[in-house]
Amino acid sequence: MSKSKREVIKLISSAGTKHFYTTTKNKSHNLKKIKLKKFDPVIKKHVIYNEAKLK
């Protein structure tokens, strides 16, 4: 079996609520860390989510 070109990552809320999303990204195309604006259900607002490694 070959290795997947996609890496599983965790998107952590910048609001400090410890809420996170998991997603995948292509290792060869996206070398920079991802920042996305997504909904945080804990504070019920859209905030920036930063990429972190999934342990």
From Swiss-Prot:
One of its GO terms (cellular component) is cytosolic large ribosomal subunit. Coiled coil: none annotated. SUPFAM superfamilies: Zn-binding ribosomal proteins. Belongs to the bacterial ribosomal protein bL33 family. GO terms for biological process: translation. It comes from the Bacteria. This is Large ribosomal subunit protein bL33. The gene is rpmG. The keyword Membrane does not apply. InterPro entries: Ribosomal_bL33 (IPR001705), Ribosomal_bL33_sf (IPR038584), Ribosomal_zn-bd (IPR011332). One of its GO terms (molecular function) is structural constituent of ribosome. Keywords: Ribonucleoprotein, Ribosomal protein. Disulfide bonds: none annotated.
